[in-house]
Amino acid sequence: MKKYVCTVCGYEYDPAEGDPDNGVKPGTSFDDLPADWVCPVCGAPKSEFEAA
């Protein structure tokens, strides 16, 4: 699975790790993240992420 990077702050979403602090289990692909998921660092929406 591809990693995605926030173009605002540089946070990298790694599907292998997920975002457990925000209820996203490891193994969750970027495309499967909830529509209202935001960058856990800066709050940017999914639309501000690009493939790493």
Swiss-Prot record:
Protein name per its UniProtKB record: Rubredoxin
A GO BP entry: alkane catabolic process
PANTHER family reported in the protein's UniProt record: RUBREDOXIN (PTHR47627), RUBREDOXIN-1-RELATED (PTHR47627:SF1)
Lineage of source species: Bacteria, Pseudomonadati, Thermodesulfobacteriota, Desulfovibrionia, Desulfovibrionales
Gene Ontology terms: cellular component: cytoplasm
Record function comment: Rubredoxin is a small nonheme, iron protein lacking acid-labile sulfide. Its single Fe, chelated to 4 Cys, functions as an electron acceptor and may also stabilize the conformation of the molecule.
Similarity remark: Belongs to the rubredoxin family.
Textual note on the cofactor: Binds 1 Fe(3+) ion per subunit.
Cofactor(s) needed by this chain: Fe(3+)
Keywords recorded for this protein, A-Z: Cytoplasm, Electron transport, Iron, Metal-binding, Transport
Xref: Gene3D superfamilies: 2.20.28.10
Main location: cytoplasm
Subcellular location: Cytoplasm
Rubredoxin-like domain mapped to chain residues: 1-52
CDD domains named among the record's database cross-references: rubredoxin (cd00730)
